[in-house]
A protein has these predicted regions:
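Short, contiguous, well-structured surface segments enriched in hydrophobic/aromatic residues
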Residues: 39-71, 80-111
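Generic structural signal for short, solvent-exposed loop/turn connectors between secondary structure elements
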Residues: 74-75, 103, 128
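Short linear interaction motifs
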Residues: 73-78, 109-123
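Short, well-structured alpha-helical interface segments that form or flank functional binding sites
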Residues: 79-96, 129-136, 326, 330
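Acidic, Ser/Thr/Gly/Pro-rich intrinsically disordered interaction regions
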Residues: 2-52, 119-430
Length: 430
């Protein structure tokens, strides 16, 4: 007997990462894909969003490819080749996920599904192919060894075939009989029949899996075409600036609706806060100038956001407010979160977190806690606005604190300071 051979596949992990990068490049467009293709015509879930399923496919492929690459096959530790059975089941997860991505994105794989280059098994009726033969092997050897019946007239003529064992050939007495890597026996459940031999060659199995995995390239190209087409479609639909008879809050609501359609609803809360800012009127006249500057900053950000929606792009000064922003955010989002890392705020991380208790959505106890934490910052924030802790409402204190944080950001090296124009209508005079 010869020394036992082992087998190990290598699937390029970069292939799934490249596909994932295509998804992420225009995630807001990818999220709009639904189960609408003809293949889902009779499914109860036809028409619902497919984003979760797409993400599941990507995660399953990524994890399972890593697992398959780590498996060394051919170690006969039990009666049957359980390592191969496990390998086939997990490889099927990858191939099924790729098939699902093709169906969702509308990629026709009929030609690829008819391919016979790996196994060369066209079947008794000439209608077989690599895809069907792989599924037959998995059914017979792994998942349905006591009842394989879906491949009648293709890979068997009996109504049912069964498989008592699957064993590695090399390094065993069987290699003197069978010139293959694995041998399985398929009983056909007929009188006076010894059944049929099924010979498995690992180079053929690996070749088929690698080919089906490579179809991610074709599916990725189709995804990019879908994204480009959808973006161009949106660009052709006008998004008017604020109309003469349109209130500012109505204008913000309209842009919010447009963004939800084109980019998703991730920025809904930012639009809601923009409306709150533009409708805010301070109680103290001492704060009116600072409030107006803050409103103007939001108006400027909304102008940029209008460009984002019209051009379907978040990059560049005319959209994000600055070039090469590593955060991936636009000014519109920076204003909402106002994350300025500077020495004067460095010791107040907990306080800044609790200021959110004053936004009107928290309970009375939390709001009281927010007031305490705001007072502790009065020595910093009070340089920019006037707080009246006795008479101001929670929401007014919250809005004033946000205005103070905005003006602090204008004094430091951060995205907001870089994006806001050097104009007194946005910035306090020195």
């Amino acid at each position: 007997m010869s020394e036992r051979k082992t087998f190990q596949i290598h699937l390029d992990p970069e292939l799934i990462e490249e596909f994932n990068a295509s998804l992420d490049a225009h995630e807001h467009i990818s999220e709009q894909i639904s189960f609408v293709e003809r293949t889902f015509e009779k499914k109860s879930y036809r028409g619902i969003p497919a984003w979760d399923c797409i993400c599941v496919c990507v995660h399953r492929i990524r994890d399972t490819v890593g697992y398959l690459n780590s498996q060394v096959l051919g170690k006969m530790e039990h009666g049957s080749a359980f390592d191969f059975i496990n390998f086939m089941n997990n490889a099927s997860v990858v191939l099924d996920s790729i098939d699902m991505l093709a169906k969702i994105i509308g990629v026709d794989l009929s030609q690829e599904n008819a391919r016979t280059a790996a196994f060369g098994q066209i079947g008794v009726n000439g209608k077989g192919g690599d895809k069907k033969y792989f599924e037959f092997l998995r059914s017979l050897c792994a998942v349905h060894p006591v009842e394989t019946n879906r491949f009648k007239d293709v890979y068997h003529t009996a109504d049912i075939v069964t498989c008592p064992y699957l064993t590695w050939v090399s390094g065993s007495p069987l290699e003197m009989i069978w010139d293959c890597d694995l041998h399985a026996h398929a009983f056909v459940n007929e009188a006076n029949s010894w059944g049929e031999d099924v010979c498995v060659y690992m180079d053929q199995v690996f070749a088929h899996i690698k080919y089906r995995y490579s179809l991610l390239n074709k599916i990725g190209c189709a995804l990019e075409r879908f994204q480009d087409g959808k973006i161009e479609e949106f660009r052709k639909i006008p998004v008017p600036a604020r109309l003469a008879d349109e209130t500012e809050t109505a204008y913000v609501d309209r842009l919010k609706g447009v963004e939800a359609e084109r980019f998703g609803s991730n920025n809904d809360l930012v639009y809601d806060f923009a409306k709150a800012v533009l409708s805010f009127e301070p109680t103290s006249p001492a704060n009116k100038t600072a409030v107006e500057r803050y409103k103007n900053a939001w108006r400027f950000a909304l102008d940029l956001q209008l460009n984002v929606l019209r051009d379907m792009s978040r990059e560049g000064i005319e959209h994000a407010g600055i070039n090469d922003d590593d955060t991936g955010w636009v000014l519109f989002e920076h204003l909402e979160y106002c994350n300025c890392r500077c020495d004067e705020l460095s010791g107040f991380g907990y306080n800044l977190e609790k200021l959110g208790y004053l936004d009107g959505t928290s309970g009375e106890s939390d709001a009281a806690r927010g007031r305490v934490k705001l007072k502790e910052m009065d020595c910093i924030l009070g340089k920019h606005v006037v707080f009246d802790y006795e008479n101001d409402s929670d929401t007014e204190l919250y809005m004033l604190s946000r205005i103070a944080l905005y003006e602090i950001a204008l004094e430091h090296n951060c995205e907001i300071n870089e994006a806001i124009p050097l104009d007194r209508c946005y910035r306090p005079q020195k």
